[in-house]
Structure formats: structure tokens, C-alpha cells
């Protein structure tokens, strides 16, 4: 007999040395019946395991167990049962429980018999699927404790939420950089009490109108070579705006050290005058983490800063409750969480100025854009919807003219075509002729090598700085094929184009051969934006004076040590087989979401997303109330695409955004 068959026989009492016995009725806590799985609830039996008859041979049971396994059906490889069949003496059967069911039962029996005077134990699986996190050191005393009376009153007034296992463990919320360059009084972390602090609370908050109770926050510090430094955890009451000053230490606070090995736990108490908060209530108790003593690392030097990573985890306090259930599809008037402004993968990122893929982030002192840029009020200072589709206009010309003014037929701002590009030409032009591209010596550029080797590119084209459009031009009686169109925002004076960075219905300039004769011909033009004639120019959107606006140009600068960014993509150039960079103020998906949805974001805060490249480098991008994006580093470096984005929560704008990218240091 083979060894496998011998081992199988041992499962079923053919080996006299041992016998495995089980009673699956104990899996059910039923008090009125002593045999529920065979009497009252036989339909539940398959949920707990498989029943075999005792008259079947051991080998037959073994083979049937293998043949019923999913692994056999897909690979035809025999996998021994994880849990052996056992004797169910009360039913005269052999029962093989599901592994998870048996494990749950065993853990429950261990827990019942555990002596509360013994130390706690930690349970883990090899693959990390089962964990019981270490709790850390609880810090209290000066911080208010949860009020059980208020919690009970809130339950009586509105109903109690369902208890679940997610209430028992800490979940990741965010991480914060603490570097040796941060001085005393610098705020590293500020978060108001509310469901947004915890991913499970945020998820469940969609089902309720109100909440109440405290949240526990756990901080873990990790750093290399750290010698000293302290942080202060400060509880700031509702109605007080934290400031970056040591005067904040006049509020209740506790200190913890950078060399702290164990995690530190704080409770953010719910200081309220009502039974509960509506989801729109952001004026709640805040927890602020401030630098108390500067971080010291003796291994750091002038060209190399050092720091720690402070990991922030949260879980609901014992008194946290949700109140006033609402249907899942109902929308609250105050707005929703801005958790879907950036798609999870960069393969879905295109610009809001041009429709090609985003390839980089460009940090600038100032970022500005009006067209297709939306804020958290669902408003834009531009004239286009957050989508790309062909521009539709009509144009009337006579006497063989090729330059004219288009009349919008599809628009959201009267007279300005939806999708019209938002930069003007750099100088006065008389559109005519062909491309004229030369190098610094005045020699014509006709090859890629000549273009790449040229130290200076001179663009003498008479329609430079205009956008190239594929055209469907139609007019009654005109049977000729359509010609390429060149468009821009400018004042048309005879055959001249005068630059204008303010757009209105008189500045829709189109240069195109529409086969016009002496009589007036009105053409219906459908224009698809394809390229640009600004060979040798700086990136599109980089020059404030050439960016078009109706009246106001939305603009932003640095905030709290965070730098504004453009999202960079490119557009193809005319004549030369090359491209030019385009600066976009938003990802188009962000523009679309802000235009369609009302999101909840305080004016002094960021909606934070973590961007991770394929090599594991990451940095946080914060989107402010005006719709502009920021990063906390001065240079994001070379990123390995594709990138992924994940929502991290709401952060105060005055706090530097986190990253694991080391900024370039310069020594004078």
C-alpha cells in the first residue's frame, strides 16, 4: 500500500492510535435544539462542510474530496485536503469541515477559555491575511475622555449604528514627513474630527446623515540615525484656527519623542453642544502635531537633509456612532468627499488644455489658466466644457479672402466657440505663404539632424503661434475638398492679426482657404485641433501674457511651503516632425468632476492624493479650493510611468505635502 493511502486510512480510525471526532452542531449557537444541523437547519450543513457516509471506503472518500477541489478541475493536480474528514458520532457520519469554519470555531473556543489575567497574544497568518495589530502606548490625562452620557443620549435620539469588527483595529490614514529642516512651531499634521479620518468611517458615512463621538489616532515614528527631537500633540477646540507658533502649546497637549519605539495613541474628543454633527460640520475638535524640539540627526550635513516618517493610523473611539440612516442614492446638500478627482492610473490622465497624455509635472512659481479650469464651486472663468470634441463655427467671406472671423454655433459663453484654444499669437502677423524655419545662420532647416543640431531656431512663418486644425468645410455650391485651418484668438484688421489675450466674439480668427469668390460665401466649419505652428517657442501656457481670458485669469502661487504645478503633455508641431510642451492646470478628469459634482473642501485645505511611480517613489499632490494642484517638493525628478494615484484625505494647506523624493540640494 502506498504511503498516501496509509495516511488516508489514519484519517478514518483505521489506525488504532488516534481518532478525530467533531460535532458541527457546536458551530451554531442554538439553545432550543441539540441537533440543529440534522433537525431544524439541515439546509445550513453545506455551508459548514461536506458529509460522507460511513459505509464508503476511505480511499473513495479521499478521491472524491480531491475531485471536488477547484485545483483539480483547473490543473488536474491532486491536493491533499487541508482539513481531514472527522467522525460525527452523533449522526453516524463522517464530516469534513471547511478550513475557515474550523479555524473560526477553534479560535472562539480558545478565546472562551483564555485567562484574562494572562498577557495578550498576537495572532498572524504566514501570508499576513490575519493580523491583530499591536496597540501602542495610550497617552491621556490632559485630553478629554469620551462622554458615555452624550453617546447614550445621541443613540436614544436617532438610533444606534451596527457594531462591526472594523471598530477594533487601526487603519492607515496618511503619513507625514518630519525633517531636520523643520523648526520649532512648524505644524506637521492637522485634522478635524470626523468620518474622513478613517477609511471605514468614510465609507459608512455615505449611508448616514449625522455622526458623533471620538476617534483614536495612532502615530508611529520611523527614522534612521535620529538622535533627538520631540513632537507635541495638541487638542484644539472647535472654532479655533491653528497657527504655526509655539503659542499653540498653551492648549492641552502631550509630548512624544522621535526615539519612541512603541506607537503612541491619542484620542480626539468630540467637544460638541448638540447631540450629533451633520456630515457637513467641519467646525469640530482638531488634533495638531507640532514640532516641539527640532529633529536632530548627527549624520546629516549641509548637502543632505534627514528626517523621519510619521505614520498616522485611526480607528473610531468607543463612543463613535452614526445617526439618521439615509438611502444610498440620496445626495446631501453640503457636498461629497473629493476622493475621485484623479483617476487611479496615469493611463487615463489627459490635459485640460490639450487632449494628449500627461507625461510629467512642472513646478512653477505661478500657475494660471481660465479655460476648462474649474473650482470647488463648480465654476469656471473660461468658455469650454470639460471635454474635447470638434469646434463648430460658420464663417462668411468674399473677394477671395482667406482670413476671417468665425461665428460660434456651439457655445456655453455666447459668441465664443466651445473648445476654442486659449493662447494668442506672440506678435502682429499677416497670415500668408508657407513655413519658414531657419537656424542661427539663416540656413533653411529641412532635416531632423539640422533641427536637432541648431543652436537657434528662427520661425519666420507668417502664421506662427496659431493652432492647426483638420477641417470639414462645407458651403452650398462649393465642391472642392476642405483645406487645413489655422486658428487663434486675435483682432482681425484687414489682412492683419493683432494679438489679444482677452477673448470675445470678434476675435475668433480663422485663416483658411474656403474657395471664396467675389460673392459672399458662408461656410459651415467643423474644426478638430491637431497641432501648433509655434516652432521654437516656449511651452504653451507658460507665458501669462499670451494666455487668453474673458476678463479674469485664475492664478495661484506657493502655499505653506507647497509649490503649484502644471501637468505637462505635448502637441505636434507643423512642418517639423517634433512636438512642443503644453502646460495644463488640471487633469481633464479633475475638471470634469469639479464641474459635475459639489465636493466638500474647506478653503484652507487640500484634497490630497498620493502619486506612486513604477519604482516606488511617491509624493503627495494637493488640490485646493480653487482647483489648482500643489506638491511639497521643489523637484519631482524623473518618474517611471505608469503612475498610480490614491486618495489620502483632507490636509491643511499650510502643512507641507509629504513625499519620499529628496529635493536637490545646492551648496553655494
UniProtKB/Swiss-Prot annotation:
The record gives the effect of mutating residue 125 to G/H/L/R/V as: No effect on precursor cleavage by calcivirin
GO CC annotation terms, alphabetical: host cell cytoplasm; T=3 icosahedral viral capsid
Q: What are the entry keywords?
A: Capsid protein, Disulfide bond, Host cytoplasm, T=3 icosahedral capsid protein, Virion
Residues under site feature: Interaction with host receptor F11R/JAM-1: 459, 462
Q: Which Pfam families match?
A: Calici_coat
- Presence of keyword Disulfide bond: yes
Classification via InterPro entries: Calicivirus_coat (IPR004005), Rhv-like (IPR033703), Viral_coat (IPR029053)
Q: What is the effect of changing residue 124 to Q/D?
A: Partial loss of precursor cleavage by calcivirin
Marked site: Cleavage: 124-125
What's the superkingdom here? Viruses
Q: Which family does it belong to?
A: Belongs to the caliciviridae capsid protein family.
What remark does the entry add?
A: Mostly expressed from a sgRNA. Expression from the g-RNA is low and occurs at a downstream start codon generating a smaller, truncated LC-VP1 (tLC-VP1) protein.
Name of this protein: Capsid protein VP1
Amino acid at each position: 500500500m502506498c504511503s498516501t493511502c496509509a495516511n488516508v486510512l489514519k484519517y478514518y480510525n483505521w489506525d488504532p492510535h488516534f481518532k478525530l471526532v467533531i460535532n458541527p452542531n457546536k458551530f451554531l449557537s442554538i439553545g432550543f435544539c441539540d441537533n440543529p444541523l440534522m433537525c431544524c437547519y439541515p439546509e445550513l450543513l453545506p455551508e459548514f462542510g461536506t458529509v460522507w457516509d460511513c459505509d464508503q471506503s476511505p480511499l473513495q472518500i479521499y478521491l472524491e474530496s480531491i475531485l471536488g477541489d477547484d485545483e483539480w478541475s483547473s490543473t488536474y493536480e491532486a491536493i491533499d485536503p487541508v482539513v481531514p474528514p472527522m467522525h460525527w458520532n452523533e449522526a453516524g457520519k463522517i464530516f469534513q469541515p471547511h478550513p475557515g469554519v474550523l479555524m473560526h470555531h477553534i479560535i472562539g473556543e480558545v478565546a472562551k477559555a483564555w485567562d484574562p489575567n494572562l498577557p495578550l497574544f498576537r495572532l498572524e497568518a504566514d501570508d499576513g491575511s490575519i493580523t491583530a495589530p499591536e496597540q501602542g502606548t495610550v497617552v491621556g490625562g490632559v485630553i478629554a475622555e469620551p462622554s458615555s452620557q452624550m453617546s447614550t443620549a445621541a443613540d436614544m435620539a436617532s438610533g444606534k449604528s451596527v457594531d462591526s469588527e472594523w471598530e477594533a483595529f487601526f487603519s492607515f490614514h496618511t503619513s507625514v514627513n518630519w525633517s531636520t529642516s523643520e523648526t520649532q512651531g512648524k505644524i506637521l499634521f492637522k485634522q478635524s474630527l470626523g468620518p474622513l479620518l478613517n477609511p471605514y468611517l468614510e465609507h459608512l458615512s455615505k449611508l448616514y446623515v449625522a455622526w458623533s463621538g471620538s476617534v483614536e489616532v495612532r502615530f508611529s515614528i520611523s527614522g534612521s540615525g535620529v538622535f533627538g527631537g520631540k513632537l507635541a500633540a495638541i487638542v484644539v477646540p472647535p472654532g479655533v484656527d491653528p497657527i504655526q507658533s509655539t503659542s499653540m502649546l498653551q492648549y492641552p497637549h502631550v509630548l512624544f519623542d522621535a526615539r519612541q519605539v512603541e506607537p503612541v495613541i491619542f484620542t480626539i474628543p468630540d467637544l460638541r453642544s448638540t447631540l450629533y454633527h451633520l456630515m457637513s460640520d467641519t467646525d469640530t475638535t482638531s488634533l495638531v502635531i507640532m514640532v516641539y524640539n527640532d529633529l536632530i540627526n548627527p549624520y546629516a550635513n549641509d548637502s543632505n537633509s534627514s528626517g523621519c516618517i510619521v505614520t498616522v493610523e485611526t480607528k473610531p473611539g468607543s463612543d463613535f456612532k452614526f445617526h439618521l440612516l439615509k438611502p444610498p442614492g440620496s445626495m446631501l446638500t453640503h457636498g461629497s468627499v473629493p476622493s475621485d478627482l484623479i483617476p487611479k492610473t496615469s493611463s487615463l490622465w489627459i490635459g485640460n488644455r490639450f487632449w494628449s497624455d500627461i507625461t510629467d509635472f512642472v513646478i512653477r512659481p505661478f500657475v494660471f489658466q481660465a479655460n476648462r479650469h474649474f473650482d470647488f464651486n463648480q465654476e469656471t472663468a473660461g468658455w469650454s466644457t470639460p471635454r474635447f470634441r470638434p469646434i463648430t463655427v460658420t464663417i462668411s467671406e468674399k473677394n477671395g479672402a482667406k482670413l476671417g472671423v468665425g461665428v460660434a454655433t456651439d457655445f456655453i459663453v455666447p459668441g465664443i466657440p466651445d473648445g476654442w484654444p486659449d493662447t494668442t499669437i506672440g506678435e502682429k502677423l499677416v497670415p500668408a505663404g508657407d513655413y519658414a524655419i531657419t537656424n542661427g545662420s539663416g540656413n533653411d532647416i529641412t532635416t531632423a539632424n539640422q533641427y536637432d543640431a541648431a543652436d537657434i531656431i528662427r520661425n519666420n512663418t507668417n502664421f506662427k503661434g496659431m493652432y492647426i486644425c483638420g477641417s470639414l468645410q462645407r458651403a452650398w455650391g462649393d465642391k472642392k475638398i476642405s483645406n487645413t485651418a489655422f486658428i487663434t484668438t486675435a483682432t482681425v484688421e484687414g489682412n492683419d492679426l493683432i494679438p489679444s489675450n482677452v477673448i470675445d466674439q470678434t476675435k475668433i480668427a480663422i485663416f483658411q482657404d474656403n474657395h471664396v469668390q467675389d460673392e459672399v460665401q458662408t461656410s459651415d466649419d467643423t474644426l478638430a485641433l491637431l497641432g501648433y505652428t509655434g516652432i521654437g517657442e516656449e511651452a504653451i501656457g507658460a507665458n501669462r501674457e499670451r494666455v487668453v481670458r474673458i476678463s479674469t485669469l485664475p492664478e495661484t502661487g506657493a502655499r505653506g511651503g507647497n509649490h503649484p504645478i502644471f501637468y505637462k503633455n505635448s502637441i505636434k508641431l507643423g512642418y517639423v516632425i517634433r512636438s512642443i510642451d503644453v502646460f495644463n492646470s488640471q487633469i481633464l478628469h479633475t475638471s470634469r468632476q469639479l464641474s459635475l459634482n459639489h465636493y466638500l473642501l474647506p478653503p484652507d485645505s487640500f484634497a490630497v492624493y498620493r502619486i506612486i511611480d513604477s519604482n516606488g517613489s511617491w509624493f503627495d499632490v494637493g488640490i485646493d479650493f480653487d482647483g489648482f494642484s500643489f506638491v511639497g517638493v521643489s523637484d519631482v525628478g524623473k518618474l517611471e510611468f505608469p503612475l498610480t494615484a490614491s486618495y489620502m484625505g483632507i490636509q491643511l494647506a499650510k502643512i507641507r505635502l509629504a513625499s519620499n523624493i529628496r529635493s536637490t540640494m545646492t551648496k553655494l
